[in-house]
């Protein structure tokens, strides 16, 4: 999963240039999360989410906040073979990679609404264990952590649904 490199067009206004970024999507934090974010002014907070349907289509959403303001958003869809927790772990790992490449000098908090990614001590399946291991390895490389956030408070939730819808629309157009 590679955010920000494979899926953005060169003309997109969301690319980071000297701190001047424009969000691609409208993303907002709830009022109580904004107060929590105020304590993290030196941090980059990345909200991630993934949506998976029963046909193996997935949508991913990402919203990056600095000081409570969205500075970057992205959503896209793709095919996925595997479970939803595994997908969410891969999305978290991709967000950590994006932060390391685009914002290498920021402390990073990745927030996901998938509790098993954050809380699993010994993941059940091999594929999920590998995905969680990828997340933990990326967290060891610096000031990077992954934390739980409720789905209701996750601004990336709607972006993931939007990414899933965009994939469905692309497949309908391709079939026509």
Residue ranges and their predicted role:
Residues 5, 56, 68-69, 141, ...:
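Intrinsic-disorder/low-complexity loop/linker signature
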Residues 16-17, 61, 140:
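Secreted/luminal cysteine- and crosslink-motif detector
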Residues 50-55, 93-161, 166:
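RNase H catalytic domain
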Residues 87, 91:
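Loop-to-helix element that buttresses phosphate recognition and phosphoryl-transfer chemistry
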């Amino acid at each position: 999963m590679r955010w920000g490199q494979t899926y953005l067009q060169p003309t997109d206004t969301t690319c980071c240039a000297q701190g001047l970024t424009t969000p691609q999507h409208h993303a907002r934090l709830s009022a109580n999360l904004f107060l929590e974010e105020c304590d993290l002014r030196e941090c980059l907070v990345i909200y991630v989410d993934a949506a998976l349907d029963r046909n193996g289509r997935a949508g991913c959403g990402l919203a990056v906040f600095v000081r409570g303001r969205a500075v970057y958003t992205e959503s896209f869809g793709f095919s996925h073979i595997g479970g939803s927790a595994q997908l969410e772990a891969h999305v978290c790992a991709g967000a950590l990679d994006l932060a390391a490449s685009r914002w290498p000098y920021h402390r990073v908090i990745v927030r996901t609404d998938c509790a098993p990614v954050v809380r699993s001590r010994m993941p059940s399946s091999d594929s999920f264990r590998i995905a969680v291991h990828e997340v933990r390895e990326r967290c060891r490389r610096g000031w990077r952590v992954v934390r739980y956030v409720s789905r209701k408070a996750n601004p990336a939730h709607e972006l993931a649904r939007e990414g899933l819808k965009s994939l469905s629309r692309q497949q309908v157009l391709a079939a026509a």
